[in-house]
Amino acid sequence: MAKYLAQIIVMGVQVVGRAFARALRQEFAASRAAADARGRAGHRSAAASNLSGLSLQEAQQILNVSKLSPEEVQKNYEHLFKVNDKSVGGSFYLQSKVVRAKERLDEELKIQAQEDREKGQMPHT
């Protein structure tokens, strides 16, 4: 009886071990895929995301901007900043999120402008 019980325990541990190993491999693959996707976004953009604490997509969602145009960013920023003003019953937390999102988008616009200038200055060979 003890022999069968020991065999059942060993088999159970093996099954759980294999499942854990498979889950670990899947997690590593997903992590690698996410890292590759972030790598394609560009080093400057990733650095800006790290500094501001917001990704470009998050900032665009907060300010409800689909394309990066300075006019649309500024217009939406001003509207959301006024609406969330504490004196009119708004939320300081949301207002600060709006400010951080604008800073992140301004940084991205600056990066894009710099990359455009660098492309324009490169000699054509």
Curated annotation (Swiss-Prot):
Compartment list: Mitochondrion inner membrane
Induction entry: By CSF2/GM-CSF.
Main localization category: mitochondrion
Family: Belongs to the TIM16/PAM16 family.
Record's bilayer topology term: Peripheral membrane protein
Keyword Hydrolase set for record: no
Top-rank taxon, per record: Eukaryota
InterPro entries: J_dom_sf, Tim16
Segments for region (J-like): 58-110
UniProt cross-references to Gene3D superfamilies, sorted A to Z: DnaJ domain
GO biological process entries: intracellular protein transport; negative regulation of ATP-dependent activity; ossification; protein import into mitochondrial matrix
GO cellular component: mitochondrial inner membrane; mitochondrial matrix; mitochondrion; PAM complex, Tim23 associated import motor; protein-containing complex; TIM23 mitochondrial import inner membrane translocase complex
Tissue localization of expression: Ubiquitously expressed.
Residue positions, PTM Phosphoserine: S69
Disease: Spondylometaphyseal dysplasia, Megarbane-Dagher-Melike type: An autosomal recessive disease characterized by pre- and postnatal short stature, developmental delay, dysmorphic facial appearance, narrow chest, prominent abdomen, platyspondyly, and short limbs.
Protein name: Mitochondrial import inner membrane translocase subunit TIM16
Role played: Regulates ATP-dependent protein translocation into the mitochondrial matrix. Inhibits DNAJC19 stimulation of HSPA9/Mortalin ATPase activity.
